[in-house]
Amino acid sequence: MSSVVETVTNLVTPILDENHFELVDVEFVKEGKSWYLRVYIDKPNGINIEECALVSDKLSEKLDSCDPDPIPQAYYLEVSSPGAERPLKKEKDYERALNKYIHISLYQAIDGQKVYEGTMVDLNKETLTLEYRVKTRTVTKTFDRNKIAKARLAIKF
């Protein structure tokens, strides 16, 4: 599957560069009996449906013209924004999320917990620091970034 992701990344990058869009993520996943190629794009002020359709059309043309076909099985192509709970994958994503409410999942539990949500109050190459509430107390905890399995923006309720 990684070769599909790499191929699609290489095909879509010039389209995005030409339109000043950013590639957030590419996924090629099987759900039930169907395969989905998902391309998440964004730009500083947010992406709209027409821009997603433009990228979808251009990427579809490029994929159809490849020989041999990089994706031999049938699949659904979806191009969309990363949504309100966008994943944090690149360094730039983490920098933009500073002072925002985020969700992190750890590879291994710390203090019996693998999932944390809070405001990221500090960030450097090795660690990030979250501030969150435990009942009536505000807690600040620093996490090694190499111990974080996934991170994303979160909506605070």
Swiss-Prot record:
It comes from the Bacteria. This is Ribosome maturation factor RimP. GO terms for cellular component: cytosol. Keywords: Cytoplasm, Ribosome biogenesis. Required for maturation of 30S ribosomal subunits. Its main location: cytoplasm. HAMAP family: RimP. One of its GO terms (biological process) is translation. InterPro entries: Ribosome_maturation_RimP (IPR003728), RimP_C (IPR028998), RimP_C_sf (IPR036847), RimP_N (IPR028989), RimP_N_sf (IPR035956). It is found in: Cytoplasm. Belongs to the RimP family. The keyword rRNA-binding does not apply. It comes from Ligilactobacillus salivarius (strain UCC118) (Lactobacillus salivarius).
